[in-house]
């Protein structure tokens, strides 16, 4: 008669009726194997076998001394090293995950309403190079100043702040062109992007105007660039005057004040 085959769980239960058997561990070369017994969520006894690779590290004297401290409390009988049941080796970090709808609500509604681009010519919500009034920007500048000057009379009654260039007598002042240069002998295919690429390496500028034909939209052959600093304008004249560009020789000079 053959002996009945029993599982390891039945053998453990027969030897340890009142509880789980103690954990066992043994070292095999550079590896340590630990066998533990515990109950799972269904109340059944299970065996957990874990393998650890042993590594030797050089630590400071303070760390080595701290590892030899006598344990106390629930960890009084624990072996050297942290116990996952009583010790946390890292700080607990709580994270809140946001969905796509929560992210949309978290955005500032004021920022969402701001335009991505603003035209320097007509203040529209587009780039200056795509402005439909680009060919008549010089005329629009004088009209915009006249309209703003007329609006000052109404804003003065409400006590609002009036910029210095719009106060009484300011419209008679001459425009500051001390840092403006005139670039001529440009090709018909010249664009604002080409002009910006030509001058941006010299220094920062505050305004740029490329003269174009109304009907064809081609370049008239000249442009104006207002640099932020006069020394950069002088450097632009020195570098670009007589410089070859698009099979033409550029002519760069100081911009003459308008009469």
Curated annotation (Swiss-Prot):
One of its GO terms (biological process) is formation of cytoplasmic translation initiation complex. Residues 179-257 form the RRM domain. The keyword RNA-binding applies. It is found in: Cytoplasm. Keywords: Cytoplasm, Initiation factor, Protein biosynthesis, RNA-binding. InterPro entries: eIF3_g (IPR017334), eIF3g_N (IPR024675), eIF3G_RRM (IPR034240), Nucleotide-bd_a/b_plait_sf (IPR012677), RBD_domain_sf (IPR035979), RRM_dom (IPR000504). Disulfide bonds: none annotated. One of its GO terms (molecular function) is RNA binding. GO terms for cellular component: eukaryotic 43S preinitiation complex; eukaryotic 48S preinitiation complex; eukaryotic translation initiation factor 3 complex. The keyword Protein biosynthesis applies. Signal peptide: none annotated. RNA-binding component of the eukaryotic translation initiation factor 3 (eIF-3) complex, which is involved in protein synthesis of a specialized repertoire of mRNAs and, together with other initiation factors, stimulates binding of mRNA and methionyl-tRNAi to the 40S ribosome. The eIF-3 complex specifically targets and initiates translation of a subset of mRNAs involved in cell proliferation. This subunit can bind 18S rRNA. Belongs to the eIF-3 subunit G family. Component of the eukaryotic translation initiation factor 3 (eIF-3) complex. The eIF-3 complex interacts with pix. This is Eukaryotic translation initiation factor 3 subunit G-2. The lineage of its organism: Eukaryota, Metazoa, Ecdysozoa, Arthropoda, Hexapoda. The gene is eIF3g2.
């Amino acid at each position: 008669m053959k002996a009945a085959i029993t599982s390891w769980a039945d053998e453990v239960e027969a030897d340890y009726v009142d509880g789980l058997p103690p954990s066992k561990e043994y070292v095999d070369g550079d590896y340590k194997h630990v066998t533990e017994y515990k109950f799972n969520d269904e109340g059944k006894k299970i065996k957990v076998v874990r393998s650890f690779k042993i590594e030797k590290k050089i630590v400071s004297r303070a760390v080595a001394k701290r590892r030899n401290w006598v344990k106390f409390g629930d960890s009084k009988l624990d072996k050297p090293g942290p116990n996952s049941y009583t010790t946390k080796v890292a700080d607990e970090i709580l994270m809140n995950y946001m969905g796509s709808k929560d992210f949309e609500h978290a955005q500032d509604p004021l920022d969402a309403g701001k335009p991505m681009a603003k035209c320097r010519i007509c203040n529209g919500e587009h780039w200056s190079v795509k402005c439909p009034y680009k060919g008549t920007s010089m005329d629009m500048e004088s009209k915009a100043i006249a309209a703003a000057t007329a609006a000052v009379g109404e804003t003065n009654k409400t006590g609002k702040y009036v910029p210095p260039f719009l106060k009484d007598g300011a419209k008679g002042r001459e425009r500051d062109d001390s840092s403006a240069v005139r670039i001529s002998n440009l090709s018909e295919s010249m664009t604002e992007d080409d002009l910006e690429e030509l001058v941006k390496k010299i220094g920062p500028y505050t305004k740029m105007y490329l003269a174009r034909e109304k009907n064809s939209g081609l370049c008239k052959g000249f442009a104006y660039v207002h640099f932020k600093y006069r020394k950069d304008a002088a450097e632009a004249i020195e570098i670009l005057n007589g410089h070859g560009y698009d099979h033409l020789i550029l002519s760069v000079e100081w911009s003459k004040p308008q009469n």
